[in-house]
Amino acid sequence: MRVLIPLSLFAVAVSGQNSDLEGTWSSKSNQVFTGPGFYDPIEELLIEPALPGISYSFTADGYFEEAMYQVSGNPQDPKCPVAVLIFQHGTYEVKDDGQLVLTPIEVDGRQLLSQPCDDEGVSTYSRYYQAESFKSYLVQLDTYYGKQSLQLYGSDGAPLQPLFLAYKPPVMLPTITLNPTASDDAQPTSNAKRDLISHVRRSIENRHKTNAVKKTAPNIEKYWWGSLALIGVGSIAFLLS
Protein backbone atom coordinates (compact mmCIF):
# COMPACT_ATOMS: atom_id res chain seq x y z
CA MET A 1 0.00 0.00 0.00
CA ARG A 2 1.37 3.38 -0.97
CA VAL A 3 1.26 6.12 1.67
CA LEU A 4 1.44 9.74 0.60
CA ILE A 5 2.77 12.21 3.15
CA PRO A 6 2.29 15.96 2.49
CA LEU A 7 5.54 17.79 1.94
CA SER A 8 4.48 20.42 4.49
CA LEU A 9 4.70 17.88 7.32
CA PHE A 10 8.41 17.34 6.91
CA ALA A 11 10.71 19.24 9.25
CA VAL A 12 14.38 18.60 9.80
CA ALA A 13 15.20 19.11 13.46
CA VAL A 14 18.47 20.68 14.52
CA SER A 15 20.06 20.08 17.91
CA GLY A 16 19.84 22.86 20.47
CA GLN A 17 23.14 24.69 20.50
CA ASN A 18 23.93 28.39 20.77
CA SER A 19 25.24 28.45 17.20
CA ASP A 20 21.84 27.21 16.00
CA LEU A 21 20.13 30.18 17.65
CA GLU A 22 22.46 32.70 16.02
CA GLY A 23 20.67 35.17 13.77
CA THR A 24 17.70 37.53 13.64
CA TRP A 25 14.36 35.74 13.76
CA SER A 26 11.05 37.37 12.88
CA SER A 27 7.40 36.36 13.02
CA LYS A 28 5.28 35.64 9.95
CA SER A 29 4.49 39.32 9.23
CA ASN A 30 8.20 39.76 8.41
CA GLN A 31 7.95 43.45 9.34
CA VAL A 32 9.45 43.54 12.84
CA PHE A 33 13.22 43.20 13.21
CA THR A 34 15.63 43.94 16.01
CA GLY A 35 18.35 46.54 15.60
CA PRO A 36 18.49 50.30 15.00
CA GLY A 37 15.48 50.19 12.70
CA PHE A 38 13.27 49.45 15.71
CA TYR A 39 14.91 51.34 18.59
CA ASP A 40 17.12 54.43 18.54
CA PRO A 41 18.82 54.63 21.97
CA ILE A 42 20.41 58.01 21.24
CA GLU A 43 17.11 59.79 20.62
CA GLU A 44 15.16 57.39 22.86
CA LEU A 45 12.79 56.48 20.03
CA LEU A 46 10.80 53.31 19.43
CA ILE A 47 9.98 53.14 15.72
CA GLU A 48 6.60 51.66 14.78
CA PRO A 49 6.81 48.95 12.08
CA ALA A 50 4.23 48.64 9.30
CA LEU A 51 2.61 45.55 10.86
CA PRO A 52 2.58 43.94 14.32
CA GLY A 53 5.02 41.14 15.03
CA ILE A 54 7.92 40.00 17.14
CA SER A 55 11.62 39.50 16.57
CA TYR A 56 14.44 37.94 18.55
CA SER A 57 18.13 38.07 17.76
CA PHE A 58 20.81 35.86 19.28
CA THR A 59 24.59 35.87 19.05
CA ALA A 60 26.62 32.69 19.32
CA ASP A 61 28.34 34.04 22.46
CA GLY A 62 25.26 34.54 24.62
CA TYR A 63 23.64 37.91 23.83
CA PHE A 64 20.05 38.52 22.76
CA GLU A 65 17.79 41.35 21.64
CA GLU A 66 13.99 41.52 21.48
CA ALA A 67 11.66 43.75 19.47
CA MET A 68 7.91 43.46 19.89
CA TYR A 69 4.96 45.30 18.36
CA GLN A 70 1.55 44.11 19.51
CA VAL A 71 -1.94 45.46 18.83
CA SER A 72 -4.84 44.23 20.96
CA GLY A 73 -8.46 44.76 20.05
CA ASN A 74 -10.94 46.32 22.45
CA PRO A 75 -14.13 44.21 22.45
CA GLN A 76 -16.05 46.97 24.23
CA ASP A 77 -15.04 49.58 21.67
CA PRO A 78 -13.46 48.32 18.41
CA LYS A 79 -12.32 51.86 17.63
CA CYS A 80 -10.01 51.82 20.66
CA PRO A 81 -7.27 49.22 20.10
CA VAL A 82 -4.26 49.13 22.43
CA ALA A 83 -0.78 49.07 20.88
CA VAL A 84 2.55 48.45 22.59
CA LEU A 85 6.15 48.49 21.38
CA ILE A 86 8.79 46.81 23.55
CA PHE A 87 12.58 46.71 23.31
CA GLN A 88 14.89 44.62 25.50
CA HIS A 89 18.37 43.21 25.22
CA GLY A 90 20.82 41.38 27.45
CA THR A 91 22.21 37.88 27.84
CA TYR A 92 20.75 34.43 27.42
CA GLU A 93 21.60 30.95 28.64
CA VAL A 94 20.61 27.49 27.48
CA LYS A 95 20.29 25.24 30.54
CA ASP A 96 21.26 21.56 30.61
CA ASP A 97 17.58 20.61 30.45
CA GLY A 98 17.09 22.67 27.28
CA GLN A 99 15.46 25.64 28.99
CA LEU A 100 16.18 29.01 27.35
CA VAL A 101 16.52 31.87 29.86
CA LEU A 102 16.71 35.54 28.79
CA THR A 103 18.11 38.06 31.28
CA PRO A 104 17.64 41.64 30.03
CA ILE A 105 19.76 44.64 31.01
CA GLU A 106 17.33 46.20 33.45
CA VAL A 107 18.01 49.88 32.72
CA ASP A 108 17.84 49.51 28.92
CA GLY A 109 14.37 48.08 28.38
CA ARG A 110 11.80 50.47 26.86
CA GLN A 111 8.04 50.37 26.29
CA LEU A 112 5.73 52.65 24.30
CA LEU A 113 2.06 52.15 25.18
CA SER A 114 -0.69 53.68 23.06
CA GLN A 115 -4.30 53.79 24.28
CA PRO A 116 -5.85 56.34 21.90
CA CYS A 117 -9.22 56.48 23.66
CA ASP A 118 -7.69 56.99 27.11
CA ASP A 119 -4.41 58.87 26.66
CA GLU A 120 -5.72 61.80 24.60
CA GLY A 121 -3.34 60.94 21.79
CA VAL A 122 -0.19 61.00 23.97
CA SER A 123 1.46 57.59 24.22
CA THR A 124 3.20 56.53 27.44
CA TYR A 125 6.96 55.97 27.13
CA SER A 126 8.57 54.14 30.04
CA ARG A 127 11.30 51.78 31.16
CA TYR A 128 10.52 48.10 30.82
CA TYR A 129 12.01 44.98 32.35
CA GLN A 130 10.74 41.44 32.03
CA ALA A 131 12.97 38.39 32.33
CA GLU A 132 11.81 35.57 30.08
CA SER A 133 12.07 31.80 30.31
CA PHE A 134 11.16 29.27 27.64
CA LYS A 135 10.82 25.61 28.55
CA SER A 136 12.57 24.59 25.34
CA TYR A 137 13.15 25.57 21.74
CA LEU A 138 13.58 23.89 18.39
CA VAL A 139 15.47 25.12 15.34
CA GLN A 140 14.27 23.35 12.23
CA LEU A 141 13.93 23.63 8.47
CA ASP A 142 10.29 24.29 7.68
CA THR A 143 9.99 22.94 4.15
CA TYR A 144 6.51 24.41 3.69
CA TYR A 145 7.94 27.95 3.86
CA GLY A 146 11.43 26.91 2.79
CA LYS A 147 13.05 28.69 5.74
CA GLN A 148 14.84 27.93 8.96
CA SER A 149 12.35 28.37 11.78
CA LEU A 150 12.64 28.82 15.52
CA GLN A 151 9.89 27.30 17.64
CA LEU A 152 9.83 28.58 21.22
CA TYR A 153 7.85 26.80 23.92
CA GLY A 154 6.44 28.78 26.85
CA SER A 155 7.06 27.96 30.50
CA ASP A 156 4.01 25.67 30.37
CA GLY A 157 5.35 23.85 27.32
CA ALA A 158 2.82 25.34 24.90
CA PRO A 159 4.24 26.30 21.48
CA LEU A 160 4.41 30.01 20.71
CA GLN A 161 4.11 31.52 17.25
CA PRO A 162 6.99 30.34 15.04
CA LEU A 163 9.78 32.70 14.04
CA PHE A 164 11.71 32.56 10.79
CA LEU A 165 15.37 33.31 10.14
CA ALA A 166 15.66 36.76 8.55
CA TYR A 167 19.35 37.68 8.92
CA LYS A 168 22.57 35.91 9.80
CA PRO A 169 24.68 37.16 11.48
CA PRO A 170 22.02 39.01 13.51
CA VAL A 171 21.10 42.67 13.09
CA MET A 172 21.41 44.11 16.60
CA LEU A 173 22.33 47.19 18.58
CA PRO A 174 25.56 47.03 20.62
CA THR A 175 25.30 44.43 23.38
CA ILE A 176 26.65 46.81 26.05
CA THR A 177 24.47 48.86 28.42
CA LEU A 178 23.05 51.59 26.18
CA ASN A 179 21.56 53.91 28.80
CA PRO A 180 23.51 53.57 32.07
CA THR A 181 22.04 55.42 35.04
CA ALA A 182 23.69 57.13 37.99
CA SER A 183 22.64 54.23 40.20
CA ASP A 184 24.66 51.70 38.22
CA ASP A 185 27.54 50.18 40.15
CA ALA A 186 30.00 50.98 37.38
CA GLN A 187 29.33 54.64 36.60
CA PRO A 188 30.85 55.65 33.27
CA THR A 189 33.18 58.62 32.98
CA SER A 190 32.45 61.48 30.58
CA ASN A 191 34.86 59.97 28.04
CA ALA A 192 33.20 56.57 28.41
CA LYS A 193 29.79 58.13 27.86
CA ARG A 194 31.02 59.84 24.71
CA ASP A 195 32.53 56.57 23.49
CA LEU A 196 29.23 54.81 24.17
CA ILE A 197 27.22 57.41 22.23
CA SER A 198 29.72 57.26 19.37
CA HIS A 199 29.53 53.46 19.32
CA VAL A 200 25.74 53.44 19.24
CA ARG A 201 25.59 56.21 16.65
CA ARG A 202 27.94 54.28 14.34
CA SER A 203 25.70 51.25 14.68
CA ILE A 204 22.67 53.32 13.67
CA GLU A 205 24.47 55.02 10.79
CA ASN A 206 25.67 51.65 9.48
CA ARG A 207 22.24 50.03 9.59
CA HIS A 208 22.32 49.59 5.80
CA LYS A 209 25.97 48.52 5.75
CA THR A 210 25.63 45.41 7.90
CA ASN A 211 27.36 42.20 6.82
CA ALA A 212 24.24 40.29 7.84
CA VAL A 213 22.76 38.36 4.95
CA LYS A 214 19.00 38.41 4.49
CA LYS A 215 17.70 34.87 4.31
CA THR A 216 15.22 34.12 1.52
CA ALA A 217 13.26 30.97 0.85
CA PRO A 218 14.66 28.60 -1.76
CA ASN A 219 12.50 27.65 -4.72
CA ILE A 220 10.97 24.45 -3.31
CA GLU A 221 8.90 23.87 -6.44
CA LYS A 222 12.04 23.85 -8.58
CA TYR A 223 13.61 21.13 -6.42
CA TRP A 224 10.34 19.16 -6.45
CA TRP A 225 10.14 19.02 -10.25
CA GLY A 226 13.87 18.34 -10.49
CA SER A 227 13.54 15.36 -8.14
CA LEU A 228 10.53 14.10 -10.10
CA ALA A 229 12.50 14.28 -13.35
CA LEU A 230 15.40 12.32 -11.84
CA ILE A 231 12.99 9.63 -10.61
CA GLY A 232 11.52 9.38 -14.11
CA VAL A 233 14.94 9.03 -15.75
CA GLY A 234 15.93 6.41 -13.19
CA SER A 235 12.73 4.42 -13.79
CA ILE A 236 13.25 4.41 -17.58
CA ALA A 237 16.87 3.29 -17.16
CA PHE A 238 15.74 0.48 -14.86
CA LEU A 239 13.10 -0.76 -17.33
CA LEU A 240 15.55 -0.71 -20.24
CA SER A 241 18.28 -2.55 -18.35
UniProtKB/Swiss-Prot annotation:
Signal peptide segment: 1-16
Protein's UniProt keywords contain Nucleus: no
Cellular localisation: Endoplasmic reticulum membrane
Record GO biological process: 'de novo' protein folding; budding cell apical bud growth
Keywords: Endoplasmic reticulum, Membrane, Signal, Transmembrane, Transmembrane helix
All ranges on the Cytoplasmic side of the membrane: 241
Cellular component terms (Gene Ontology): endoplasmic reticulum membrane
Cell cycle recorded as keyword: no
Lumenal topological domain: 17-222
A single MF term (Gene Ontology): unfolded protein binding
Membrane topology label: Single-pass type I membrane protein
Transmembrane regions: 223-240
Superkingdom of the source species: Eukaryota
Function statement: Required for normal levels of the cell wall 1,6-beta-glucan. Involved in a protein folding machinery chaperoning proteins acting in various physiological processes including cell wall synthesis and lysis of autophagic bodies.
Family: Belongs to the ROT1 family.
Stated name of the protein: Protein ROT1
